[in-house]
Amino acid sequence: MEDLSHDLMGQWCNAIKDCVKVYSDKRTRLWSFEVKVKINRSNVREAFFQTVSNSSSANFGYLVAKEINSDAVKELRILSSSHGIGVILLDAENPLESQIIIPARERNNIDWNTANRLAEENMDFKQYIDHIRVFYQSYKINKSDWI
């Protein structure tokens, strides 16, 4: 298991504590997607760094947008090479046709402090963490939990 301070872990919500205890063998990879309608030159850095911040609780982080202006793509490539965030061009009409423009680089460690903050602020994320814990305890996937 990752080296975690007992004092710090004592401040986490129970969902995070329970997940960390069973996550040590990493049979899964956690993914984070920050979805925007449009990325252009004026909002590219803000959207990107929001993705960086919100994806530290995942092994892979992606910035997803329905529209990405060509002048923003160069900046995204530069930022992605430094921070490992991937970029997906979303086809809203046919999501299976969406394109990975820049693949994300895998992070080996999860920022559990950020995961704890997200779990305390967002019940959907807390439920997601609970599903991961259940998977690790039972090695079974209940498909209805993930839809």
Segments predicted by a language model, with ranges:
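Conserved catalytic cores of phosphodiester-cleaving nucleases, focusing on short active-site segments
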Residues: 1-11, 28-40
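Non-catalytic C-terminal interaction segments of nucleic acid-processing enzymes
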Residues: 20-23, 77-147
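Short acidic alpha-helical/loop segments enriched in Asp/Glu that coordinate divalent cations
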Residues: 11-13, 47
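Histidine-anchored nucleotide/phosphate-binding helix
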Residues: 46-54
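Nucleic-acid nuclease catalytic cores
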Residues: 39-44, 57-95
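Short, charged beta->alpha transition segments
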Residues: 16-22, 50
